Amino acid sequence: GLGIFGAAGMSAEQLETELSWIDERLDGKPYGLDLLIPDNVVGKEESFQPDRLLEAIPRGHIEYTEGILRGQGIDAVGLDKGREEALFIGRNLHPSGAEASMDVAFRHPIRLIANALGVPPDSMLKQAKSKDVAVAALVGAKEHALRQAKAGVDIIVAAGGEAGGHCGVVPTMVLIPEVAEVLEEYPEVALLGAGGIVTGRQMAATMAMGAAGVWTASVWLTTPEAETNPIVKTKMIEATSRDTVRSKSRTGKPSRQLRSLWTDAWEATEAPEPLPMPLQSLVSHPALAKVDKLSQSGHEGAQDLA
């Protein structure tokens, strides 16, 4: 297997620190990096302007989020500052921030770089090719797979709707054969399957449908090494296959996550429509960071939201 480091939520400076830590401990063993450079994001076509991002958040969304917290006995102290601190998310998703992250990435001995929510930028493809680094792209539909293959990626990760995090609606069992058929015209592109894969029999089934291997993620969040909030880790272990939802409440794009009072609140009839990326993250990140901290200190209201 090949370990992949998820760096979507990190600044270029943080990424440098983390990759240096990895390099010091892997003793030359190969590893990969997963970034998030979406095709569609608010403010992409202009220079990064943090003040304009903050101004674009409707007051109603802020008040609704504060109301969710108050309903669980959590105050809103620090959320304004938290939104300012969360601007790194918008910066990372902006082309300028993405380029900074890629500059850091290619200074390290990564063997694979992956991107989600769109075709990798030309600069990623060119730098990767010059350094003999494989490029992977995550897709949730056969049409997306075709775009990625035409763009020149080396690996396509077909992630079914069961996948944790950002995902489409096509089930894994339907998506893998569809993408495998598309890639018959691109034999140089490898296919990995993802989405709800935990056991050996699920891996075997995925490969029987045409994938060369699998890409797993959520399953590792419950391991002893994972830095997952222990409250969330317990919820994941105890959850059944019916305890996840596909929600825009975290990032503004559909992502599969454990159902909680947080996701329920954003599905309520009185809830505002989640904002587009990255604005919804600026709303959710400071609130959920507070929930995460309080839940680990024993706050029952926060634990229900986590």
Region spans (language model):
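Conserved active-site-proximal phosphate/metal-binding subdomains
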Residues: 48-65, 169-192, 198-306
